Structure formats: C-alpha cells, structure tokens
Amino acid sequence: MIPQTSSLPKPHGGVLVERIRVAHPREYDHLPALELDERAYADLELIATGVYSPLEGFMGQADYLSVLEEMRLTNGLPWSIPITLGVSAQDAASYRKTVRLTKDGRTVGLLDVEEQYRPDKEHEALAVYRTTDLAHPGVAALFARGDVYLAGKVQLLTLDRGPFPEHHYTPRETRQLFQERGWQTIVAFQTRNPIHRAHEYLHKVALESLDGLFLHPLVGSTKSDDVPAPVRMAAYKVLLERYYPQNRVLLGVYPAAMRYAGPREAILHAISRKNYGCTHFIVGRDHAGVGNYYGPYEAQAIFDHFRPEEIGIHILKFEQTFYCVTCAAVVSPRTCPHDTQHHLVLSGTRVRELLRAGSPLPPEFTRPEVAEVLRAAYQTL
C-alpha cells in the first residue's frame, strides 16, 4: 500500500492499495484453479490496482452485511456495493486455502481464502438494486453467480490492459499524469454511451472553473444493446480531437463491469474516481440507471446520506440538459424558459433505433463527426 503525499485527494481510507505481485504464473500451477468471468476479473483488477481502495480482497461476510445494511464497511468508511466472488457450492469445497485465479485458462492472480459464506441473494438484490426482477441486468447477473462467496486478500499476477492499452491507466498512473500536467482540480465523467451535445455541455461548464477533465468511459461488460466499447472509443477520440482543448483532457478507460445499480453505483463510481486522483465527479440524470427502476435524480440525492468529507470528492449535480430549438443552444431547466415542445431529447433506445435504420442523428443531438462514426459502425454490426 502506498501512502498519499501529493496535493491530490487522499485515496479512500488514506492509502492507495496495490496488490500486484511480480512472479511467473507457472509457479502456481499446483494450486486449485478458479476461472473468472469478465466481471470477476474486472473486480480483481480494480482491487489490486487500488481503484477499490481500501479493499484488499473480496469482502468477508461482516463487511458484506454492513454494506448492504449501512452502506459502510465495518470500519465505518462509506461503501455502497458488495465486491464479492461467487462459486458453486460443489466447487467451494475445493477452495480452502490459496486459489489460483485464471482468465481464459491463464493464471492471472491469487486468492488467499479466509472465509466462505452463503449470501441471501434476494436480500442483496433488494438492498443494492431495489428489486428482485430478473429483467434487471444487475439482478440477473447476481442470481447467475455461484451460491457461495469466497472472501480473502488477492494478488494480481497479470494486468490485462485489454483492447485499449494506451488508455488503460491505473490510479498510480493517473495520479502521476495529473501531477505532471499541473492539474490540481480534476473532474471525472463516467459514461457507457457515446458523447452527445448535452454531455459536452456538462464537460465544458466544469472546465470553465477546473483544471482538467478525466473522460472515463466504462468498457467492462454492459447490456447487449449498449453501444460496443470500440465504437464508443472511436467516437470519443474524434470528438476530443475536434472540439476539446487537448491539454486539458485525459481519456482513460474504466474497466469495471456495469452493475446498473443506480444510486448505489453512483457512490462506487465517485469513490473510484477519487482513488484515481480526481477532485470532482459529475453525476447527471439517472446515473447508472436502467429502465424505470430508479428516479431520475436519486443518484444525486443518495450522496446526502454522507458528510461531504466522508466521500472526499466534490459531487457536481446537473439536471437534465437538452437542445432547445428556440434558444438554439444546449440548455437546462435552469436556463431555458421554453416548454418541452421546444426541446430535442433523444433516448438511448431511440438513438440505437436510428443507427440500426441507417438514419442520420440530428446535429443538435451530437457532433457530425461522432454521428458518422456511429453510423458507419452500425452498418457493419
């Protein structure tokens, strides 16, 4: 673990966890193997690189229950979503001590099993997602996992930087980059969608008073109908090249899986960005939401459950923004006097329908260069 000494915000809990071990994976071939799916590997990486500081491993039952009931770890630190590793009851008997963690058959890490326990998944679903509806993608993923949770500290042996290695930064690396650039105030923006004009508006409003923007799209597992990560990354790049000041933006990828936990996931996203070194985090309308499971601004209101210093990152709360044809600008309810018939608002579902049909996206909704990247990509999907 690395003490925090720079002017950037301290990591959650005061130290940046690093549990990366330099060793040849073949040294551990004698250990029982546990194959990780995409979500479990993402959690392993995020623990080991410090994104999930102060966690050093998958949660034991005491922390798990405390997070469900209180949104805090047993040491009192705010934490909103259990980070756990599920296996089948049959396989659990084989995992009693040190376990070799594999991805696609390759050894990528180690887990020192300290505890096994059975969760109440219905209770977990209601606490985290506020529903047990299997149509909710987060709930479906929860019930598809094994019924026994393994807890213990982890070590990462292989950091897989995925398909975007030049943008795949660890918290240690982003903190170094922010310092090299002389940024003292950094706003992070989380997205799983292509950037449209309303997003651009939020970014530039924030950049009027802050030093840098950390554009940090999630590229882990998402719903099947979300825009694929390679397409989104191409769209982000063309947008940044044409419309953003290059010396004030850093594009990175957030390798987490999307949980669609709405308000609780907003807290996890904010804490994670604090660990990357950011001082501010944008939370807009229906952050990390899906369907109609959460109210449009519940992900903002949940931060009121904590004292600001407990979260340790400034939350920038924005209302829905949209293009007003009468104002001829991107505006919000705070700045636009016109009713909704003057507003251009396209849902993600409608955008995907237009793309699949080969129809152009309105320039009031997104930049033409972005629209062309999306149109071309969808013609080949």
From Swiss-Prot:
Annotated pathway: Sulfur metabolism; hydrogen sulfide biosynthesis; sulfite from sulfate: step 1/3
CDD domains in the record: ATPS
EC number: 2.7.7.4
Highest taxon above the source species: Bacteria
Pfam families hit by this protein: ATP-sulfurylase, PUA_2
MF terms in GO: ATP binding; sulfate adenylyltransferase (ATP) activity
Catalytic reactions on record: sulfate + ATP + H(+) = adenosine 5'-phosphosulfate + diphosphate
Family annotation (NCBIfam families): PRK04149.1 (NF003166), sopT (TIGR00339)
UniProt xrefs under PANTHER family: PTHR43509, SULFATE ADENYLYLTRANSFERASE
Record family assignment: Belongs to the sulfate adenylyltransferase family.
Protein name: Sulfate adenylyltransferase
Organism: Chloroflexus aurantiacus (strain ATCC 29366 / DSM 635 / J-10-fl)
